[in-house]
Design a protein with these regions (language model features):
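Short helix-loop-beta connector
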Residues: 91-97, 235-236
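Short active-site oxyanion
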Residues: 94-98, 117-118, 216-220, 273-279
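SAM cofactor-binding core of SAM-dependent methyltransferases
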Residues: 96-161
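SAM-dependent nucleic-acid methyltransferase catalytic core
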Residues: 51-86, 135-255, 275, 286
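Short His-Asn-centered micro-motif
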Residues: 100-102, 122-123, 222-224, 243-245, ...
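Basic helix-extension-helix modules of the SAP/HeH family
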Residues: 1-49
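Short loop/helix-cap segments at secondary-structure boundaries that form the rim of catalytic
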Residues: 112-115, 213-214, 232-233, 287-295
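Long, positively charged, glycine-interspersed low-complexity recognition regions
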Residues: 259-321
Length: 321
């Protein structure tokens, strides 16, 4: 937020609103400095998730997401929901349709359904797409199949991982995906190692209840290349695109086979998304991506990530001019 445009009285009001102390007797520039410092330190709690919120002026407190993803997902945005939703409400209010070309774990997308949005989700990774469509169409059977396979062992983990790309039965694919996701170190399907701690603490009855509670009634799913997906959805005044592409360099899980697809073409996707008017893209912060989007607005953000929520992720949110 640009505090320089506000009067000293308005700045004092903001200090009182956001609990900023030490402003009494200060000059305007000093008060702005206090507000900027508070912006960096401000945190929001969503359940067990602590979110660093860098923009007081766009702060939205989310006390419950209500519709929570059952998946652990590398680079997932569970802890960024408050920040992302603040950018949506500030820059793209009243949107009714959200397009997600990289649905992934779906944390933000599912949150947006609680705000009245219809979500069209897409993911190129077949097992993940299969998990979501199976959860949507036959969640009770999926939950029962997972229970039958519990508990997970290291040997079973290895067997499921080796067979998931060859399996043709959708229910078996979805079951395997969920079990691998809940018991790998990072939530990655094909590149995260087995974690006994995760197997004991994250593949539980409560995780299955979380799966059953997931409401996908306002979501549709497709299994397309991201550019093709956007081409299938012409822009309307009600539509917003939220894209969370694979990180530049560390592109671990994008692709129909979930391979290490360093071949994802970030430049092509940038060209595709910039043809539209209303969109938000989140990326890891690096010079290459900044150069691709140099004709756009770029905001630096940080949110916590990892199993202990103590690491900070340096990311950027990109919006059209």
């Amino acid at each position: 937020m640009d505090y320089s445009t506000k009067t000293k009285e308005e700045l004092i009001t903001l200090c009182k609103k956001y609990g900023v102390k030490g402003y009494s007797g200060k000059k305007k520039a000093e008060i702005i400095s206090l507000l900027n410092k508070k912006s960096i330190e401000e945190t929001t709690v969503i359940g067990e998730h602590i979110i660093v919120n860098p923009v007081i002026g766009e702060h939205i407190t989310v006390t419950s997401t209500k519709n929570v993803s059952p998946l652990r997902y590398p680079g997932g945005k569970t802890r960024a929901i408050s920040i992302l939703s603040s950018y949506v409400s500030t820059h793209f209010p009243n949107k009714k349709v959200l397009l997600s070309p990289f649905f992934g774990g779906g944390s933000f997308e599912l949150f947006m359904t609680t705000k009245g949005c219809t979500v069209h989700g897409n993911d190129l990774f077949v097992p993940l797409y299969t998990f979501w469509t199976t959860t949507q169409s036959d969640c009770d059977t999926l939950a029962a199949a997972i229970k039958e396979q519990m508990p997970m062992t290291k040997e079973k983990f290895r067997t499921l991982r080796e067979s998931i790309l060859q399996e043709n039965d959708s229910m078996k694919v979805a079951t395997s995906y969920f079990m691998i996701n809940r018991t790998s170190f990072s939530g990655a399907t094909l590149c995260g190692g087995y974690s006994q701690q995760a197997a004991e603490g994250r593949l539980t009855e409560s995780s299955i209840e979380k799966l059953k509670a997931c409401n996908l009634s306002a979501v549709t799913f497709t299994n397309l290349d991201a550019n093709a997906f956007l081409d299938c959805h012409p822009e309307t005044t009600d539509t917003l695109v939220y894209a969370d592409p694979p990180y530049y360099i560390d592109t671990y899980i994008y692709g129909k086979n979930g391979d290490m697809h360093e071949n994802f073409n970030h430049a092509t996707f940038a060209d595709t998304i910039k043809k539209r008017s209303d969109w938000i893209v989140s990326y890891n912060d690096c010079k290459y991506i900044r150069d691709l989007y140099k004709d756009c607005r770029i905001f630096e953000v940080k949110w916590s990530y990892g199993m202990n929520a103590k690491k900070a992720s340096s990311e950027i949110i990109i919006l059209p001019l």
